[in-house]
Curated annotation (Swiss-Prot):
Source domain of life: Eukaryota
Signal peptide: 1-18
Location within or outside the cell: Secreted
Organism this protein belongs to: Aspergillus clavatus (strain ATCC 1007 / CBS 513.65 / DSM 816 / NCTC 3887 / NRRL 1 / QM 1276 / 107)
EC identifiers of the protein: 3.2.1.4
Name of the protein this chain belongs to: Probable endo-beta-1,4-glucanase celB
Chief subcellular location: secreted
Glycosylation sites per record: N46, N118, N136, N234, N291
Recorded GO MF terms: cellulase activity
Coiled-coil segments on the chain, per record: none
Sorted UniProt keywords: Carbohydrate metabolism, Cellulose degradation, Glycoprotein, Glycosidase, Hydrolase, Polysaccharide degradation, Secreted, Signal
Catalytic activity: Endohydrolysis of (1->4)-beta-D-glucosidic linkages in cellulose, lichenin and cereal beta-D-glucans
Active site: E215, E220
UniProt cross-references to Pfam families, sorted A to Z: Glyco_hydro_7 (PF00840)
């Protein structure tokens, strides 16, 4: 049985001693973004970012013992979520560069590896976009809109993933009596993979439930391959699951568009149509059936801009049809996508509002083969080994910049940002 978490009800709990905010206050790096309209052009927003709560130190109140261990919550400190909230405090982060994150104006650099005390560490940061108030996540509503950003993937070798995507998290990060920190400290993460994490909406997950929500992968990529993929789920908001039901709540594989996997093997890469040795712009459009911001999502369209030239998405053949975008006919044969609501369900989430996540990571278990090896990309079966990446590419990183969204046709080509 799928269980929907009643997030708002948590605010009605008695005012027990909550997981407290520690003495080190959070300092959010500023990251300028832009909102674009047909009438006013692209206008600057004074937004910022926050690292996922998993990067924050959560420890025993009055001591230095972590509230989590390598296997999850410390049962002595966290036998239940109420006791855990009384026993634990979360500390802020004041220097994001120590976690591989640097911002400057409207650009953000994410590093996989950093040097600390002559040792290499892999913080593998994941950050979320905060609204201008710095307390809540920025909720993007993108039906009949477009989302655009510039990216430099030249330092992302095989096996790396510089990802930018949306998930249907709560705007407050699940702020409640037991989680006063909320979005300002990066709580509330969820996605369509339904992982079991130590915390759910900033509260101790002593029941070891899985947590699911709708996910729209705008960009999963390195210098050799890329994909964009909607992942619908069969309900709205945050979903709790247990056991086998965690495999049926969301479309974990999704309906993806990877040019290489679909036969366009000279389209994306070094000196190809989209040249990954140089920065470029990625545009994703969410077209609705009635061309309104409340209509049913019918198509997810992709294009690129590089060196002043607009580049249409790769044109490929699928089941005898010529396609270059994600539509219901394209997704009809892709697993459980339609059964879980397909583009309609994904569009409903985009209409309600989703949170922007950006990350860099590699894959010790599968070497990121699903993205860039075999039928999915040109990388060998061993190039994605994280130990090889660390030795050969210690400066691996991705830069996202000039993030903007708004009316169709307003975010790219000759539009000025101001």
């Amino acid at each position: 049985m799928v269980r929907t978490f009643a997030v708002t009800a948590l605010a009605l709990l008695p005012l027990v001693a909550a997981q407290q905010i520690g003495s080190t206050k959070e300092v959010h790096p500023q990251l300028t973004t832009y909102k674009c309209t047909s009438q006013g052009g692209c206008v600057k927003q004074n937004t910022s970012i926050v690292l996922d709560s998993g990067s924050h130190w959560i420890h025993a109140k009055g001591g230095e013992v972590s509230c989590t261990t390598s296997s999850g919550l410390d049962p002595a400190l966290c036998p239940d979520k109420e006791t855990c909230a009384e026993n634990c405090v979360v500390e802020g982060i004041t220097d994001y560069s120590q976690y591989g994150v640097q911002t400057r104006g409207d650009a953000m650099l994410l590093r996989e590896y950093i040097k600390q005390n002559n040792q290499t560490k892999a913080p593998s940061p994941r950050v979320y976009l905060l609204d201008e108030d710095g307390e809540n996540y920025s909720m993007l509503r993108l039906l009949n809109q477009e989302f655009t950003f510039d990216v430099d993937v030249s330092k992302l070798p095989c096996g790396m993933n510089g990802a930018l995507y949306f998930s249907e998290m709560s705007a407050s990060g699940g702020r409640s009596a037991l989680n006063p920190a909320g979005a300002a400290y990066g709580t509330g993460y969820c996605d369509a993979q339904c992982y079991t994490n130590a915390w759910i909406n900033g509260e101790a997950n002593t029941a070891k439930a899985g947590l699911c929500c709708q996910e729209m992968d705008i960009w999963e990529a390195n210098a050799r391959a890329n994909a964009f993929t909607p992942h619908p789920c069969n309900s709205t908001g945050l979903l709790g699951c247990a056991g086998d039901e965690c495999n049926s709540v969301c479309d974990k594989a999704g309906c993806g568009f990877n040019p290489y996997a679909l036969g366009a093997r000279d389209y994306y890469g070094t000196a190809m149509t989209v040249d990954t040795t140089k920065p470029f712009t990625v545009v994703t459009q969410f077209l609705t059936a009635d061309n309104s911001t409340t209509g049913a999502l019918r198509e997810i369209r992709r294009l690129y801009v590089q060196a002043g030239q607009v580049i249409q998405n790769a044109v490929v053949k699928v089941d005898g049809r010529t396609v270059n975008s994600i539509t219901e006919p394209y997704c009809a044969s892709q697993g459980v996508f339609e059964g879980l609501g397909g583009l309609r369900r994904m569009g409903e989430a985009l209409g309600r509002g989703m949170v922007l996540s950006m990350s860099i990571w590699n894959d010790a278990g599968g070497f990121m083969h699903w993205l860039d090896s075999g039928n999915s990309g040109p990388c060998s079966s061993t190039e994605g080994d994280p130990s090889l990446i660390e030795n050969k590419y210690p400066d691996t990183a991705v830069t996202f910049s000039k993030i903007r969204w708004g009316d169709l046709g307003t975010t790219f080509a000759t539009r000025r940002l101001h």
